[in-house]
Amino acid sequence: MSGTYAGDSRMTSPQAAEPTAKTGPAEPAARTGPSEPAQPAAASAPGATGAAGTGSRLAWLDVLRGLAALAVVFNHFGYFVPPALNGRVYQWINPGDYGVFVFFLISGYIVPASLERKGSVRTFWVSRLFRLYPLYLLAVGVALFLFMVHIGGLRGEGSDPETSVLSQMLMMSNVLAGENLPNVVWSLSYEMVFYLLLTALFMARVHRRSSRYALAFGAAAVVLGGILPQAYFTNNLLSPRIIALVADLVVLTGLAVAVGMRGMPRMVGAALAAMVGLTLLAFNGTWLYPWEALSILALMFTGTMLYRAEQGQYSWRRAIAIAVAVLGLAIAAGVWHHLPGNMSPHEEFVWERSWFMSVFLAGLTFGIGLTFRHVTWPRFLTWLGLISYSVYLLHPALIEVYRHLTWTAHHSFWVQVLVDALFLAILIAVCSATYLFVERPMQGVGRRLAKRLDARFGPDRFPVPVRAPEAALAHSSRAAE
């Protein structure tokens, strides 16, 4: 994703970390985060919050989250990395793109498990709310504070404050012309659209067709990626502020109906919210190109398909073949549709090679993790996965503070390495604290609230059969919540 892609070249580079540079996400650093990644990442955002023990069948996901988060940090920490190492890495791979792609595969794999096991749309959205928003609001607040004291800057994608506030309400700033604050939250826009699609597909009982959706979005990235407009609505229709307001109202109303009503109205509400999200993703992206956005959805549904294969709902031969095909489509979309701009032929070749390696290695990493899912992992690695959402959202602010306090560009190689190691230690300590005192307590609040809502209004579960063993799904659900 060019977003994860940092930069106008749509790839993130060391400079992507600069607040004023339009680079990729992280840009999730590469316009690509999370987790929640899932975690994001969220599971849905880059990090997951349910601890899966080091020997648990879900521990491998925590290990992958931690690895993905560190790749994103490396991408934004580029100006602190010894130039010799940094330059060689970017000749072959964009760490930000790679990390975010891994996060999106994880989100696709783990998030549907929670929704399908419990069968409750209301519980799913309450879980998402308390899983993602508390730390998200903290990260936005910290970024604003640093901007006010002239330590951090804004990227400038969204020049209108009201539009930025409205777009941040639904974590959809990257498809509503809002400011991505902090810069890595661009990836949460695509996580949110994925959740909306999952909800609508689940309520329509067509959610098991994951392979078809993965192939469809992958093919759309190749066929339509160079045709669909970028930021069409905000540039050609009403003002960005009005579009963001209308989108917020329609999506929130649709979700309220889907969560609070019964029968056909709730299905219509879910479908309406999903249609708005998908339309914005395809036509109104302000940082990623349409081919990048569609490739992201293809990767997430590929993760879902692999989850179904692991649960016996697809044959492994079929799942692997389709996964390879989707990765090939995502690679083809990037090579075919990216805009070379002022790049020389050699620079264009390096970009294409980096894009290929980022997508390919993300898929390979996920495949290796899935293959060794029953291995017992070191506790430190699984802990990095648990705090990965904090690492993803908070590392840009810590980098700004670190850069303000110290500069290492002229130090010797080993002194610079020691300073970098100190930064990582501080980052892990801070993110461990936010996980223990912000993320985990608020997740508990969400679980208690969901139970109270069930007691007050009755369960809203859909009778959707799941073939996977109950114990396995229980683990998956806890990891996604």
Please provide the spans of the model-predicted regions.
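Transmembrane alpha-helical segments and their boundary/interface "anchor" motifs
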Residues: 97-101, 114-152, 159, 164-167, ...
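Membrane-interface helix-loop-helix regions
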Residues: 132, 136-196, 208-209, 216-235, ...
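Solvent-exposed interhelical
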Residues: 192-238, 250-271, 307-320
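Functionally critical transmembrane alpha-helices in membrane proteins and complexes, commonly lining
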Residues: 59-115, 133-136, 140, 364-365, ...
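Alpha-helical transmembrane segments of multi-pass integral membrane proteins
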Residues: 97, 292-308, 320-440
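Membrane-proximal cytoplasmic C-terminal regulatory module of class A 7TM GPCRs
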Residues: 404, 413, 440-481
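Aromatic-anchored segments of alpha-helical transmembrane domains
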Residues: 70-77, 217-231, 273-286, 325-339
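Interfacial loop-to-helix transition and helix-capping segments at the boundaries
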Residues: 58-59, 88-100, 178-190, 229-250, ...
